[in-house]
A protein has these predicted regions:
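A short amphipathic helical element positioned immediately N-terminal to and/or at the very start
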Residues: 5-24, 126-127, 131
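Transmembrane helix-loop-helix hairpins at lipid-water interfaces of multipass membrane proteins
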Residues: 24-84, 164-169
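Juxtamembrane helix-loop junctions of ABC transporter transmembrane domains
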Residues: 6, 37-45, 77-124, 128, ...
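Transmembrane helices of ABC transporter permease
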Residues: 19, 23-34, 147-196
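Helix-boundary and loop/linker segments of multi-pass membrane transporters
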Residues: 13-20, 60-67, 133-134, 148-149
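Membrane-proximal cytosolic tails and large cytosolic loops of membrane proteins
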Residues: 1-7, 47, 58
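Membrane-interfacial segments
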Residues: 49-57, 95-96, 100, 115, ...
């Protein structure tokens, strides 16, 4: 029988975050929707520019009602982004505080079961550091970094979809350019790291 290796790093953080699974999932979904909504103003600007170019140089032929509707669309996108991101942060903070509470209660109940000599040997400063600082780091990840990580993964996908839907040739050229830039950067930093 092989012992299962305890999880560390990001895997352990996700395991702790999943103790409040419904709130974490709600935060991830809302953060993804906020990332999508953040692109709505750019889409509205694209449609406005397209409409202006369609009638240029006779700008009097512009339909002001459609321009105003695109303006409202942009404003709605900004508002939706703010509301959805706020809701995502609310869910992630509720999950983080619930997880912190459980971690502290479990840690302190475990401390109550260990021999008194352990407390003397370790010292109160180290125990306080664990309860205050180390457990608080979990809150930073669940409450703040998790929604931002999700948005950081969703945003490039949404941007790629928008680029490809506007003009697949220019979108593909843009995506290939970004990929080449990442390859060059990794090669350059790889050599720099090898020198050290």
């Amino acid at each position: 029988m092989s012992k299962q290796k305890p999880k560390t790093g990001m895997a352990r953080m996700m395991q702790l975050a999943m103790t409040k699974k419904p709130l974490v999932i709600a935060s991830v979904v809302l953060s993804s929707l906020a990332a999508v909504a953040s692109f709505i103003p750019y889409i509205a600007i694209y449609f406005i520019i397209r409409q202006i170019l369609a009638v240029y140089p006779d700008l009097s032929a512009l339909g002001q009602t459609s321009l105003f509707s695109y303006g409202w669309m942009a404003l709605g996108g900004v508002t939706a982004n703010i509301i959805l991101y706020f809701a995502a942060l609310m869910c992630s903070h509720l999950a983080a505080f619930g997880t912190l509470y459980e971690l502290k209660v479990n840690f302190l109940s475990h401390l109550a079961k260990v021999p008194l000599g352990f407390h003397v040997m370790i010292g109160s400063g180290k125990l306080r550091k664990i309860t205050d600082e180390n457990i608080e780091n979990v809150e930073k990840f669940i409450a703040h970094q998790l929604p931002d990580i999700v948005a950081a993964f969703v945003s490039p996908v949404v941007m790629a979809v928008i680029l490809l839907s506007v003009d697949w040739r220019l979108g593909l050229a843009s995506i290939v350019g970004v990929v080449i830039a990442f390859i060059i950067q990794s090669i350059a930093y790889g050599r720099e790291g090898a020198k050290k």
